[in-house]
């Protein structure tokens, strides 16, 4: 179950890896297949003030960012791999810039694990079977997944805020209904689809920059509903593949902002401490002496 919990946390934050580059042009070929990612044709757009267009895009994205003090949600989570399919319910309470409480429930057992996250640490509490508690620095998840993220990015993704605002736009293409924005960072190439009316994030496709890896991620946000004057994506799907494929869906059944935290829990003091599984260093081969 701890592996499942890490998977859910990881793919809530996977889109935070994009960094900045400096050139702005018009997309002529969209990157929808990994094997075409290196053959994108980009043509210059004469007589177009690209800097002004990009500034306008970023300004509108900032304006639609949800401002909040607290967030509660009940989320139906489905995940599927080649070997396993699992359904669970996540009960989430978030205090902005401070603390995240997550209760993981699996039928018919009820709550089987609690997760507490703050800016510095992650605590996993197993509440069924062999009860245990595991303390880790937040860097532990970064190290085990090779994906950099922080608490601020995690909370933005949970409430549905765009999380690539610190990146420069490389390319863009606009039509009557959609705006395609292309970013390239240190880890991923990211093609983001926005609604051209109110700049809701509809889709994000990430491909690994490293040609030696085959890591891809597709994220879709849909079923937007008005909440406190904001648009909130109540359904999200995530498909990730590298050596194997993982599909996750997040269906927000209940959600509210700026109310008291509903799913807080105390950190037990009598549970058996469990150490995180450390990565074993790869032994270097030494040349045999003749």
Language-model features and meaning:
Residues 23, 99-152:
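An acidic-aromatic
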Residues 19-76, 80-85, 275-290:
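N-terminal leader/targeting segments and the immediate start of mature chains
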Residues 20-28, 170-279:
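Gly/Pro-enriched, hydrophobic low-complexity segments
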């Amino acid at each position: 179950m701890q592996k499942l919990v890490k998977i859910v946390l990881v793919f809530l934050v996977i889109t935070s890896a994009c960094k900045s580059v400096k050139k702005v042009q018009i997309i002529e070929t969209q990157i929808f297949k990994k094997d075409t990612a290196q053959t994108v044709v980009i043509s210059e757009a004469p007589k177009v003030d690209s800097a002004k267009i990009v500034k306008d895009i970023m300004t509108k994205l900032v304006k639609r960012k949800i401002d909040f003090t607290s967030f509660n949600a009940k989320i139906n989570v489905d995940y599927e791999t080649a070997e396993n399919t699992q359904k669970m319910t996540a009960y989430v309470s978030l205090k902005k810039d401070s603390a995240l409480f997550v209760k993981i429930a699996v039928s018919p057992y009820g709550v089987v694990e609690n997760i507490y996250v703050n800016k510095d640490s992650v605590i996993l509490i197993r509440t069924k079977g062999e009860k245990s508690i595991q303390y880790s620095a937040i860097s532990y998840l970064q190290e085990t997944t090779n994906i950099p993220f922080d608490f601020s990015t995690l909370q933005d993704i949970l409430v549905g805020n765009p999380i690539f605002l610190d990146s420069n736009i490389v390319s863009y293409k606009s039509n009557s209904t959609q705006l395609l924005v292309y970013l390239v960072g240190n880890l991923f190439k990211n093609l983001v689809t926005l609604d051209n009316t109110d700049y809701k994030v509809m889709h994000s496709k990430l491909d690994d920059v490293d040609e030696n890896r085959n890591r891809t991620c597709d994220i879709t946000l849909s079923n937007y509903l008005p909440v406190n004057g904001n648009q909130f994506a109540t359904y999200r799907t995530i498909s990730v593949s590298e050596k194997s494929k993982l599909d996750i869906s997040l269906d927000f059944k209940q959600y509210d902002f700026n109310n008291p935290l509903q799913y807080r829990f105390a950190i037990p003091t009598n549970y058996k401490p469990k150490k995180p599984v450390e990565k074993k260093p790869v032994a270097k081969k030494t040349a045999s002496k003749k």
